[in-house]
């Protein structure tokens, strides 16, 4: 059997692509080296932020707004919502370049973002402490996503729509010819007109020339109480320290507040190098500088987890066809800020398989930028 689209890697982007392409009427085969959702990629740990006024650059805003529409639609397929509109407050020094980008994105796209000085911040959320020179940019319409629930939902919907799924079966080779793409797996060979490579951190095992660097990251849950929950209107947050370190976190659930550090981490070259949480001496203390200064009421570390970022050289996404192979789309280099975009990236992949022109300007995400 020849498929219209084979998906290599069915985590966040691959799961979304499998659903949207199958829903569009294509014959799709989803593959994964493991059984998604799983612990080997970048999507586990229950929750991920979604921000609209994007500090990483205005080029992402149209993508994230489309993603939000798709998240809202996906949430209708579950009793438990996938998107929780908790609001997100972005904290940092008033002269922060990241916050300047947030403000610029909000202004250009007329987004609902409120600027709060330090006094107003601490009045609204007495649990938060910041220096006098800090501000907060509060996005009331943003919030967080239930990442593993999202992937489970896409996989179920794709399967119900007739998508073939081959999991726990790593792809060992990809072959291109005039008739399309052939993959080799432990279960045999499969052929399609087009392929999506969304293999995440270890994409270089299949495409060695891609400029992607795996980075071991950790996040952890700390003892909290009801003051830090959505019931008390406590928001999700990003926070920049005076030294430039970037943190992110979520409202407490079951008296546990999850937080992680966006920058830093350990460069790794193989999956076995991603040691479990607490294997690196600094893991449990990584969030202390932020918690001590900004959330001093939070208690000790309860447990944590390790994940992996697939960093591109400029930490912007890679969305492009492989050089010399226009029938193969690669989406990688999401650099630790990609999950919120998963549905729109999946939709872009489905449009690629359908032969449609992308609805977005993807020029900033082309591979050619690294050779200029």
UniProtKB/Swiss-Prot annotation:
Catalyzed chemical reaction(s): N(alpha)-methyl-L-tryptophan + O2 + H2O = L-tryptophan + formaldehyde + H2O2
Record PTM S-8alpha-FAD cysteine, positions in chain: 307
InterPro entries recorded: FAD-dep_OxRdtase (IPR006076), FAD/NAD-bd_sf (IPR036188), Me_Trp_Oxase_MTOX (IPR023493), MTOX (IPR045170)
SUPFAM superfamilies registered for this protein in UniProt: FAD-linked reductases, C-terminal domain, FAD/NAD(P)-binding domain
EC number: 1.5.3.-
Pfam families: DAO
Similarity-based family: Belongs to the MSOX/MTOX family. MTOX subfamily.
Entry function: Catalyzes the oxidative demethylation of N-methyl-L-tryptophan.
Name of the protein: N-methyl-L-tryptophan oxidase
Annotated gene: solA
